[in-house]
């Protein structure tokens, strides 16, 4: 399990670096857009397009980090109900852990299906000649970080499933 933790730590470092760079670029693009529009009175449509793409990239690349840190949206009605049951605390913990593991497995399966469909879409776009309107970037490059972020989310989901299984066996 230690080698998986090392791989996961590398992914986290990579994600933090990419998200930090995207945030800096996003702030700079918006800053340039505001300065050019309101002070220099010139239009910079590329800055708006870049900011839009960076925001989408950050959303998908940040999804894996959110899953890793437990920051994703989840419905916790089942754990709340289970905590009111008159069973031992260990049984409650195991049931809640099992439900969370099942939820993670469903999430991973859904994202894998999304990755399959989206990779076919990217290949379709790659064969075409579509480019972004203002910057002229090939659209497959624009969409590619969505696939990468989804695959990283799958990795974090599988890693958390393995951690839950390890915790369920009592190997803390």
For each feature predicted by the language model, list its residue ranges.
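Alpha-helical transmembrane segments and membrane-interface helix-loop junctions
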Residues: 1-172
């Amino acid at each position: 399990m230690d080698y998986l933790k090392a791989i996961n730590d590398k992914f986290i470092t990579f994600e933090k670096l990419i998200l930090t760079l995207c945030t800096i670029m996003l702030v700079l693009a918006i800053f340039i857009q505001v300065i050019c529009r309101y002070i220099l009175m010139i239009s910079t449509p590329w800055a708006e397009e870049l900011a839009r793409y960076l925001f989408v990239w950050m959303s998908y690349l940040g999804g894996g980090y959110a899953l890793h840190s437990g920051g994703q949206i989840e419905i916790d009605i089942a754990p709340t109900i289970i905590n009111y049951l008159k069973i031992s605390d260990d049984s409650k913990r195991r049931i809640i852990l099992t439900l969370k593991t099942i939820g993670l497995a469903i999430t991973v399966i859904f994202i894998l299906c999304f990755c399959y469909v989206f990779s076919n879409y990217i290949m379709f776009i790659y064969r075409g000649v579509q480019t972004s309107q203002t910057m002229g970037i090939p659209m497959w490059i624009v969409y590619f970080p969505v696939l990468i972020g989804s695959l990283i989310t799958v990795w974090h989901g599988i890693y958390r499933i393995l951690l839950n299984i390890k915790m369920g066996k009592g190997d803390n």
